Structure formats: structure tokens, C-alpha cells
Curated annotation (Swiss-Prot):
The gene is RUFY2. This is RUN and FYVE domain-containing protein 2. The keyword Transcription regulation does not apply. It comes from Pongo abelii (Sumatran orangutan). Interacts with BMX. Residues 37-169 form the RUN domain.
């Protein structure tokens, strides 16, 4: 039997010890779940093992006083190969209390672990074998393949967070002895450990599933709240539309009443104009001798007639405008009714929340009361107008009666004149009697003239009253114009309500699309959750090949667990880190899980 090379046996032993220490440190640190400090036993053993690995095959350097065999020389060489390592070298040299090169090397290892760059630093050192040959023998661990394997194992330590106090420790005088009792365990401990690992994996899966359920519940609750708010706003818009419709109906009724009143006023004014025309004509025929004073009254009456005709034309134009506005309102109401009929199917489910809009109804009821008060004021104005028109008609009737009396007096005077002429021709003897009678008639005529003067004064007073009535009518036309402006403002408000209604309808459609998209996302997440519930943490013994690239595991190609799916992959197929719901810190995941998680995060973003 050929004897093995003792240096190769030493390298294999150190490699196995490095594997055990690194694996135990990672597993214990992950189960510990907190930042590691200097008193953590697995971490202390790891530094001891690394010190032995770096010391293997180290050349002895001679000095004037003694032999020097330390690992600080090759570690100090890292600064020249890796520029980022200059900071750690300078901080090690500046540390107080470090007197020996071994103490500096130990401090360097601790700082490199805290920076999570120990594997990068040592990888740069292993590549430069021509420089390492100055410090190590050809059979040293750092010069052979085992050194590359150990550097590959050190990459797994990047998941560990350590907070080591280097200033207060006595790194110069520590004795580096490997404690094998931490790695020699009986079968019961191994079984308990496997059970603990399985329980931890199950708990991780459970925590992940619970976190997914919480996220789904939060998204569903937020969507429900948004749907409720939109339903409330839609019900408010429906109520406002109904109120606007009622207001439009009331305004139409008021418009109809005003039109009827305007028609009555026009009829009365026409009758009044006709009566005044007849009166003026009779006055002109009966009182030709006193035409000068009556001509002035006639001109004034004609002016009044012109003014009244102009007022009638203005009123007719306003009525035509109101009729056209009424047609526009009817068209708008038809369009609104069509829209309301089309949206009734979508608004049936929203009518159950009408109780929440009572406050709005009360406010609108107050507005209705205010509009009713305005209507009452308008009705009072109309009643006043009717009273004024009644007064005018009564005055016109009195004028007609006076004119009839004057006509009768004129006819009697003409009859008497004819009789007088006949009597003069036939009876010359009775002239004195007739003269006396004529004197009596003259007295009567003088009294009649006095009566006519008084009647003229009364006519002038009546004309002044009619002028006042015309001024009142003008004021009333101005009020009608203001009412027209108010009607236009109400029409603008109705159009604004229509715009708001259409905008709310579009918002509801967009929210419906978003709800459908969110439902699809929830179904996808549920399917992913169902798929994740079936995942199991695969044991190291059961995997011999990488699941993705299907390459066989070896000393240089070691196994790595994916913290998401639990399968085992090589370093190339699992060189990704992402935070999972089960662990807030970034952990290793495979390429497929990395792509799935990135896609899920991007889909959740707005």
C-alpha cells in the first residue's frame, strides 16, 4: 500500500475543517437571526481555522534576531492587487494596541468579514501565484486547488452580518486552537438538527404564505374602499341630477305662468289701446272747436300708443326667446332622460346607500325653500301688476262713461239747434221767446264748458297715472330680464352637472377596469401561493446535480440552496440576492425565482 503525501493529507484536513466551520457558522447565524459579535463561538472557531489555513506552507523569513513566520505579509500584499483594500490596511495599521504582525493579520480578517469582501480579497491573492511563491511553499494550501475551494466557500459568508469590536481585543496573545467538539456530533444530534432544519423551513414557508395573505387582504380592502367611495359619489351625482331636473320643471312651470300673464297683459293693453283710439276719434269729432287743447292730448296719446306698442314688441321678443329657451331645455331634458335610462342598470346597486345623502338633501331642500320664497315674491309682483291693470281698466271705463255723456249732450245740442232754425224760419214772432231760450241754452253751454274743462283736467291726471303705470311696466320688464339671466345661469349649472356626471361615469369605468386587472393579479398570486405551498426544502444528500444547468457537484462546484423554492443549485445558477417576506435581509435565490420575483414586484408597482 502506497503512503499518501502528508502535505496533501494536511490540505484535505484543513479543507474539511474549513467546510465544517463555514457551514456551521452560516447555519447558526441564520438560525440566530441577529448581528454576530466577537463572543460568538462558531465565529471564533472560523477565525482560528482561517488562521491555520493561511499558515499552512508559509515560508520562514530570517531576520537579524529571529525567525519570522507570519501571515501578515501575504495579507498586506492584497493592497497592491485590490485598490479598495487600501482602506482596511490603513485602518489596521492605525489600530492602537497591536504590536505583532499576527495581531494585525487577525484584525485584518475581522474587518474583511465585516465588509463582506474576504472572498474577493483572497481571490485576488490566489490568482497571483508568482507573488504568493515568495511567502508560501509550493505544496501550501494557498498554492493548490484547496485554496480556491476555500475562497469559493467564503462567498457564502456574505449573508452574515457581523459587528466586531477590534480595538478592545487582545489579538496579539490569543492562542488559535481548533475545538473539534463543535463538529463531532452523535446520531441523535444529527437527527434533531435535521428536524430543526425541516421545522425552520416549514416555518419560513408558513411566514411567507401569511405575508402573501396579508398583502392580498390589504389590496382587496383598499379596492373595496375605493369602490365604496365611488359608489357614494355616484349616488350624490344622481341626487343632484334629480334635484336639477325638479328645478328645471319648476322653472318651466314658472315660464308658462309668465307667458300666460304676458298674454293677458298684451290682451288688456290691446283693448286699452283700442278703447283709447275710439275715445280719441270721438273726441276729435265732437270737439272740433276746442281742437287745439285736444290735439295736444291726442299727440300725447299717440306717443303713449307708440311706447306701448314698442313695449308690446319687446315683450313679444322676450316671449319668443323664452319659447326657444324652453325648446332647448326640453331637448336637454330628453337627453338627460336618455342618459338616466341608460345608467339605471348600473345605479340599481348603488341606491341602497341613500341614507348617507340625507345631509345633502337637507341642503338642497333649503335651496328649494329659497327658490319658493323667490317665487312668492314674483307672484306678489304679478298680483301688483294685475291690480294696476284693474285700476287702469276702471279709469278707462269712467272715461268711456264721460264720453258717452258728452256725446249725448252734443246730440241734444244739435237737435235743439235744428229746432231753433226751424222755429226762426216759421215763427218770426216768437224770436224773443227763442232768444230767452237761447240765453238759457248759453248758460247751459257755459256750464257744459266748465264741465268739459274739469273733465280735461281729469283726463290729464289719468294720462299722468298711465305714464306712471308705463314706468312700472318698464321696471317689471327689467325684472323679467333679470329672471331670464337667472334662468341662463341655471342652464349653465345644469350643463356643469352634466359634465361632472360624465366625468364620474368615466372614472367608474376606469375603476371597473382596474378592479378586473386587480382580480386577475389576485388570481395569479393565489396560483403562485398554491405552487409555493407545495415547495419543500431539499436536503444536501438528495442533490447530486444542479437543477438548472444539470452539472455535477464537486469540490470546486459546491451546492447552494435557493431560499425561495428550497432547491439546490450551483453558484452560477444561484448568484442572486433578494429580500423575501420570510427574511427582511437579502438572501440567495436561483435564477428562475429571481426572474419570477422581479416580475411580480414590477407588476405590483403602479
Amino acid at each position: 500500500m502506497a503512503t499518501k503525501d502528508p502535505t496533501a493529507v494536511e490540505r484535505a484536513n484543513l479543507l474539511n475543517m474549513a467546510k465544517l466551520s463555514i457551514k456551521g457558522l452560516i447555519e447558526s447565524a441564520l438560525s440566530f437571526g441577529r448581528t454576530l459579535d466577537s463572543d460568538y463561538p462558531p465565529l471564533q472557531q472560523f477565525f482560528v481555522v482561517m488562521e491555520h489555513c493561511l499558515k499552512h506552507g508559509l515560508k520562514v523569513r530570517k531576520s537579524f534576531l529571529s525567525y519570522n513566520k507570519t501571515i501578515w505579509g501575504p495579507l498586506e500584499l492584497v493592497e497592491k492587487l485590490y485598490p479598495e483594500a487600501e482602506e482596511i490596511g490603513a485602518s489596521v495599521r492605525d489600530l492602537p494596541g497591536l504590536k505583532t504582525p499576527l495581531g494585525r493579520a487577525r484584525a485584518w480578517l475581522r474587518l474583511a468579514l465585516m465588509q463582506k469582501k474576504m472572498a474577493d480579497y483572497l481571490r485576488c491573492l490566489i490568482i497571483q501565484r508568482d507573488l504568493l511563491s515568495e511567502f508560501y511553499e509550493y505544496h501550501a494550501l494557498m498554492m493548490e486547488e484547496e485554496g480556491a475551494v476555500i475562497v469559493g466557500l467564503l462567498v457564502g459568508l456574505n449573508v452574515i452580518d457581523a459587528n466586531l469590536c477590534v480595538k478592545g481585543e487582545d489579538l496579539d496573545s490569543q492562542v488559535g486552537v481548533i475545538d473539534f467538539s463543535m463538529y463531532l456530533k452523535n446520531e441523535e444530534d444529527i437527527g434533531n438538527k435535521e428536524r430543526n432544519v425541516q421545522i425552520a423551513a416549514i416555518l419560513d414557508q408558513k411566514n411567507y404564505v401569511e405575508e402573501l395573505n396579508r398583502q392580498l387582504n390589504s389590496t382587496v380592502s383598499s379596492l373595496h374602499s375605493r369602490v365604496d367611495s365611488l359608489e357614494k359619489s355616484n349616488t350624490k351625482l344622481i341626487e343632484e341630477l334629480a334635484i336639477a331636473k325638479n328645478n328645471i320643471i319648476k322653472l318651466q312651470e314658472e315660464n308658462h305662468q309668465l307667458r300666460n300673464e304676458n298674454k293677458l297683459i298684451l290682451m288688456k293693453t290691446q283693448q286699452h289701446i283700442e278703447v283709447t283710439k275710439v275715445d280719441v276719434e270721438t273726441e276729435l269729432q265732437t270737439y272740433k272747436h276746442s281742437r287745439q287743447g285736444l290735439d295736444e292730448m291726442y299727440n300725447e296719446a299717440r306717443r303713449q300708443l307708440r311706447d306701448e306698442s314698442q313695449l308690446r314688441q319687446d315683450v313679444e321678443n322676450e316671449l319668443a326667446v323664452q319659447v326657444s329657451m324652453k325648446h332647448e331645455i326640453e331637448l336637454a331634458m330628453k337627453l338627460l332622460e336618455k342618459d338616466i335610462h341608460e345608467k339605471q342598470d348600473t345605479l340599481i346597486g348603488l341606491r341602497q346607500q341613500l341614507e348617507e345623502v340625507k345631509a345633502i338633501n337637507i341642503e338642497m331642500y333649503q335651496k328649494l325653500q329659497g327658490s319658493e320664497d323667490g317665487l312668492k315674491e314674483k307672484n306678489e309682483i304679478i298680483a301688483r301688476l294685475e291690480e294696476k291693470t284693474n285700476k287702469i281698466t276702471a279709469a278707462m271705463r269712467q272715461l268711456e262713461q264721460r264720453l258717452q255723456q258728452a256725446e249725448k249732450a252734443q246730440m241734444e245740442a244739435e237737435d235743439e239747434d235744428e229746432k231753433y232754425l226751424q222755429e226762426c224760419l216759421s215763427k218770426s214772432d216768437s224770436l224773443q221767446k227763442q232768444i230767452s231760450q237761447k240765453e238759457k241754452q248759453l248758460v247751459q253751454l257755459e256750464t257744459d264748458l266748465k264741465i268739459e274743462k274739469e273733465w280735461r283736467q281729469t283726463l290729464q291726471e289719468d294720462l299722468q297715472k298711465e305714464k306712471d303705470a308705463l314706468s312700472h311696466l318698464r321696471n317689471e320688464t327689467q325684472q323679467i330680464i333679470s329672471l331670464k339671466k337667472e334662468f341662463l345661469n341655471l342652464q349653465d349649472e345644469n350643463q356643469q352637472l352634466k359634465k361632472i356626471y360624465h366625468e364620474q361615469e368615466q372614472a367608474l369605468q376606469e375603476l371597473g377596469n382596474k378592479l378586473s386587472e386587480s382580480k386577475l393579479k389576485i388570481e395569479d398570486i393565489k396560483e403562485a401561493n398554491k405552487a409555493l405551498q407545495g415547495l419543500v426544502w431539499l436536503k444536501d444528500k438528495e442533490a447530486t446535480h444542479c437543477k438548472l444547468c444539470e452539472k455535477e457537484f464537486s469540490l470546486s462546484k459546491r451546492k447552494h440552496h435557493c431560499r425561495n423554492c428550497g432547491e439546490i443549485f450551483c453558484n452560477a445558477c444561484s448568484d442572486n440576492e433578494l429580500p423575501l417576506p420570510s427574511s427582511p435581509k437579502p438572501v440567495r435565490v436561483c435564477d428562475s425565482c429571481h426572474a419570477l420575483l422581479i416580475q411580480r414586484c414590477s407588476s405590483n408597482l403602479p
